[in-house]
């Protein structure tokens, strides 16, 4: 494939990037880019040694289990010698796709959050009634997804670039987790303004939790592909 044919070129390019990043860090007084990154990413309460212990634990406990999951997927897809390019392939007959159409998905999301709790019902009504989603794809639109805030309006805003894959639902529920946290925090007078947005050490708790809390409503967004989606996430 392409990557094998350009392995040497890509290795050289990667080496140049690493050297350049280290040089940038040294200009700013750091030993290397790794040391700078702890500051740049707002790491608090832990350092390189803690990360090493965590990394070793992942290698010891998580990797063997992940290898079992990947082996099951390979038997399901029939791919005998997978490369990293095959990682997204979950089923021989195609990956699960969500229901089509912005209006249909937004309607499903409103139903989902109304059934989840009164608080999330209020949240999703505010988001949709005030058009605080920019998630449809269009020419020239940047890739990725994120949640940001419009403080003057106490309004979260969600940006994404749907591409008619299961990732559309992932980004919807994930960013709604961030947005719901922001919506609640901005309305709580006990929370100072500079703490309304959590640090990077805790922000993903809200987003990942929302992905799991909305699992009972997968059928609203996937229809006949619900089982495939849930198997793929197992």
Which residues fall in each region the model found?
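Cation-handling catalytic/transport regions enriched in His/Asp/Glu
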Residues: 1-233
